[in-house]
Amino acid sequence: VPAKLTVSRLYPEILDETAAAEADSVGESAVVFDDEAPAPGFISGKSGVRGSDIGSATHVFMQFCDFERFARDGAEDELCRLTDDGFISRKMAEIVDIRALERFRESTFFGRMRRAVRMEREFRFNSARAAKDFTADPELKKLLEESGTELIVQGVVDAVFEEADKTLVLVDYKTDRFTREQLRDSAECERILTERHSNQLTYYRDICGEIFGRKIDETYIYSLSLGREILIY
């Protein structure tokens, strides 16, 4: 039975934190990395609304919205439709960040997405990766290489789309929130997002490139808090 490890972000040294627990089963089990975040507080019944709850609710809208309806009718009307159709609970709908969604709707990046000739949204993948690539420990790396241990990396990419000129673009929506002081320096906010998520997006880019049979030309974060895209690669 494969061992499972759930983490919020993938990074190259993750096995160094779990090496002791996995040492007895090297070569016999796989470790599953799952980047999907746990349910927010309002879903699990906890009282109070946190910034992360607002971000999670807004991300659910992005997951299920119909782009053409959203573009034509606006965020509030599309949110009502998603609520009526059961995609979003009424409690969740109350805390969706409408202003952030309207900024996205009016952005040039959303225009690019709507003009795409191919669009894969909520693109789920499972990929076997060499375990040796997830440790900086020379001895553990050698042991894992000799044993041929693999990790099953699971993930969900928000969108991969192809433009008319064949450019293949990957985008991951991020709802990280910033303090007022941080928001005064947009370059610093971009640096924080890039530093926080670039490892995860490297895996996404490489794995999606393998699945699509060609390299991803551009990899972006779209920050709902900042209201713009950030080119990572």
Regions of interest found by a model, annotated:
Residues 1-233:
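Structural signature of nuclease core domains in nucleic-acid processing machines
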